[in-house]
């Protein structure tokens, strides 16, 4: 008998929900502070930011009085633009959720029917798989509870995306107004708003998962194998919604962006976010539905799946069989500690230090990543000491492996630090402070073609170090604790999700703030401040995508291990034709998926370009600024195109595991999962980094800070036009195809895990008859 963990079960039952509630309370507090910035012209109201004005970045000595601070018309204009963006984003998400709701009901029925049929819808108890002396609940119960967990995961994912979007549209105009009083104040509003989303999502995801486990436990009793098999539905629900959010939102935002850039910047030579551009509102709406709602759902899905993979593998290990609830909840304890660590880290940006100069913005965001990683390392050590037995056995493909608690601590740390390494490598390749992006900018001297060649080369090269980081973390964690080690390494990478999301959400909020400043006709000085916030946000957004892709690789492998265990496969032999055909098809899927999403952006952008051109040609006085463009038509084009175009890629991802598993069996499906993981990660990293580099090369030329940048500019010069073309090509790569691919590799793996009993029983019908 293994000695139990130091932390009593009762304490675990209390601590996990308390940490989640603290996270939610902290996000509400941040929202309250942001709401103190009024969308009125009352200067006193907009400058009060908290109890201790001097400490939290709202100090009087930070105020830089600017013309227009007391201008009622500017404030009214900002409020009007904010309302238009908010309404556009809300209407798109409601339209998307109608379609997604239909899918959710249909797929919930599929889960119930497929899993219920494993034992012919029998209601009799069955012998447990790993301990045949005991009886476990019937497959029909697992089918019913998996369906409930799926719906819960889906609803939580949708809500987290929607609330994130609401917070972002609430904060964007407030950031613009605060920029009148200095860059420090604008930074605080944008970052606090990001923190609202980060903590709300991390804490609510943990709380819903924790409550679900405890409610299911009432029925399952000591059948933990069945309980945690049913919980996998939660991860599937979260990720399937994220797929539609990422793809639909990505198509929306890039159709508007490409359309606005091609006609506005290149043909008409007007600045970005100019109110004369008919696609400008759609472009700003897109930032919220793609980069906020889509990204929020995506990281929530990763987090839910990593937890589910760890719980499934743990349930068949010694602390699952011995019913040590604290050790079993080790993944939840890591996430709980992560919320507390991120809370402390956030205070460094909002309360302990003040941003006074533009050059301090990017280091402040990078410090968030470093501080959270360092403190989290200590946090993991504490959790591993109190939450785990000193030694225990882990199920390892038919054999038992003895693991010490310090080995599991190292597994989580390896994932955590690999995430930081991937983040900083991504920054090196996508920030215009370093030579790779400056080289891409320099290549614009000779036109768009050389810019594209340099950008593609940069993207391919940027894959090398992240892949080594992922490979080393897989090797170390698997050597120590088999597939459970890989699952907790993925959780380690995602443990600081609240800080990661805060930084990610900060970017689009700053971007929107700049757009609002331009549309409201505010001074050049204010636009410079919002551009500085946005440039820092662009780099950190690329870091966030690196995190998402790296964690997706680890999560996918952990889910793959859980699938292989649950489907009863002992070895996956690459030399057998069943597996090799799966590998080849799996490696092809990310290309097929990328082709679909890229073409969708292209065809939607085509419609947008035609509409923007039509308005410039037919509305008299539009170019002169005496007539208003028809923004609503452009918003409608983006909405209709993205809803229609998100369905084929969604079907490809959702149907592939079902078709392969049913017709070709679990061995071929395991090949498909391995193939899609291997090629998907590479394409996702290179696509995201190529697009990010082109974007920042353009911004490098536009900012004209260094002598080198000045020699390439100003806006409208030939090198600048070449950079805009590169940026436009990179838009769908970095914001649609790249980020969506990490959902493809995770979602196929978690879906295979949920349906594993069905495939093991009824799958492979073609090989049975031929």
Curated annotation (Swiss-Prot):
GO molecular function terms noted in the UniProt entry: diphosphate hydrolysis-driven proton transmembrane transporter activity; inorganic diphosphate phosphatase activity; metal ion binding; mRNA binding
NCBIfam families linked: PRK00733.3-5, V_PPase
Main localization (coarse): membrane
Binding site for Mg(2+) 1: 257, 261
PANTHER family assigned to the protein according to its UniProt record, in alphabetical order: K(+)-INSENSITIVE PYROPHOSPHATE-ENERGIZED PROTON PUMP
Organism: Arabidopsis thaliana
The protein's name: Pyrophosphate-energized vacuolar membrane proton pump 1
HAMAP family linked to this entry: PPase_energized_pump
Topological domain spans for side Cytoplasmic: 37-88, 168-190, 253-290, 351-358, 430-451, 510-538, 607-635, 694-736
Gene from which this protein is expressed: AVP1
Membrane topology: Multi-pass membrane protein
Activity regulation summary: Activated by K(+) and Mg(2+). Inhibited by Ca(2+), N,N'-dicyclohexylcarbodiimide (DCCD), N-ethylmaleimide (NEM) and aminomethylenediphosphonate (AMDP), and, to a lower extent, by fluoride (KF).
Residue positions binding substrate: 254, 734
Impact reported for residue 229 to Q: Slight reduction of PPi hydrolysis and H(+) translocation
Annotated site residues (Important for proton transport) in this chain: 246, 291, 298, 305, 735, 746
Annotated Gene Ontology cellular component terms: chloroplast; chloroplast envelope; endosome membrane; extracellular region; Golgi apparatus; mitochondrion; plant-type vacuole; plant-type vacuole membrane
UniProt signal peptide: none
